[in-house]
């Protein structure tokens, strides 16, 4: 059996996951970490001499800089080529440009005003700026928290993505190497860290995300704990940028909304409204071969400049196109979240990413899977609204329609591109059919003779998140449906229990065990007559009496406990508990 070829001073086999560099003399390959050559630094080497060869041949030869305005600084500066984004000339020119003030579009608010109820009523269409974070529910390290502190909490050996700003190129390095770079008296280049997600580190305990991002987040509300797909972690980022760092115009992945808080330093945001015209221009610009040579802010009617100073929090809604300049060394925290308020725009952004062939690394993880989970939950929400004679808010009806269209298209696409993100317990065609029925019911005005109540998040179910439902008092017996434990493949699983308002004054008394048993039996018989109804989270019995796997957080919504806390678990028609 042939043995693997060994490389480097460490004499290890080739490892695709580690950066390596070839010696131009002996032609052996070396791990950058073994010979102290960082990946971002290797591009500056013209002729590399390994530690063995530089004894006889002298040190490696470096490339010679010939310009300050191109990503490739070795190109001759003959004045024929335009300035490229991120270069030192570009940053200087950007700082000299004039822009309409962000005050024209920013909504200054107190943290306590930024609530789910407020955004449901007024929409989340414009960026919100909050100067005092306390009432937002945002908890962060103190303002003297340093880059070294990040290393202490995250670990110096964590491999992070770093952007070489002047080249707008991504590379990997260990956090301890970035810390060394940051504190070096003369930094050889501008490096920017914008994608250090630290949910899986000790630093996660120091940060509590804003209430609004937690309460409205699809992942927090709808992602089931037993999902086959790994849970997306996009809520806790630490951004470490040195002066003159620049990130070119982009829309956050999957059309996520984003919160940013500048702990110290300063960032300047260049914000563009996601109008249909601007989105079309953005897509055209993103796919053009000379994208880096065109400043997108000049292509649109208005690009607003917004300075975010120390201690300030910025909330950017779905689809806003933005670039960011770090005007002084800066540490910021941020996070991304999908929500129910702008479902259509989120889907438009995702479809644009697909058309632009955005690499998976830069997309929202398992975006389609979460849309299926959300659809399953919103079906329950629409049913509850109908049964409680509530009219769901307009944004939700529009959102569900957009979701139905997207889900249909994804199913069609699966025929030619089988890369399914449909969770295995969801019957996709049935789910789409039931959602469509609920929307038709609303649009045809089949609401009986009673006038429908316009929905308020405090009264009706559809705008209450899993968290809010969990905190509500228990619901009356009328809503009792299928109060069995959901059996999962591996174990009983309790997601957020969803409770509902119980009017103590004039509501019906809590039912007796016999009442519950009788009602439960009637439900079961009724369902069995109608045939299996898998998408109904309140039922989940197959005809053979066995439990379906139910795996959405709000499927567990059906598990509403009453004052008497009786649980009925059916197994082959027998009550076993």
UniProtKB/Swiss-Prot annotation:
Residues 198-354 form the JmjC domain. Keywords: Chromatin regulator, Dioxygenase, Iron, Metal-binding, Neurogenesis, Nucleus, Oxidoreductase, Transcription, Transcription regulation, Zinc, Zinc-finger. It comes from Danio rerio (Zebrafish). The keyword Membrane does not apply. Fe cation binds at residues 250, 252, 322. The gene is jhdm1db. Its EC number is 1.14.11.-. Binds 1 Fe(2+) ion per subunit. It is an enzyme of class 1 (oxidoreductase). Predominantly expressed in brain. Belongs to the JHDM1 histone demethylase family. JHDM1D subfamily. Residues 460-513 are annotated as: Disordered. Its cofactor is Fe(2+). This is Lysine-specific demethylase 7B. SUPFAM superfamilies: Clavaminate synthase-like (SSF51197), FYVE/PHD zinc finger (SSF57903). Histone demethylase required for brain development. Specifically demethylates dimethylated 'Lys-9' and 'Lys-27' (H3K9me2 and H3K27me2, respectively) of histone H3 and monomethylated histone H4 'Lys-20' residue (H4K20Me1), thereby playing a central role in histone code. GO terms for cellular component: nucleus. It is found in: Nucleus. Substrate binds at residues 247, 267. The PHD-type zinc finger mediates the binding to H3K4me3. Binding to H3K4me3 prevents its access to H3K9me2. It comes from the Eukaryota. Residues 472-502 have a biased composition (Basic residues). PANTHER family: PHD/F-BOX CONTAINING PROTEIN. A zinc finger (PHD-type) spans 5-56. The lineage of its organism: Eukaryota, Metazoa, Chordata, Craniata, Vertebrata. GO terms for molecular function: 2-oxoglutarate-dependent dioxygenase activity; histone demethylase activity; histone H3K27me2/H3K27me3 demethylase activity; histone H3K36 demethylase activity; histone H3K9 demethylase activity; histone H4K20 demethylase activity; transcription coregulator activity; zinc ion binding. One of its GO terms (biological process) is chromatin remodeling.
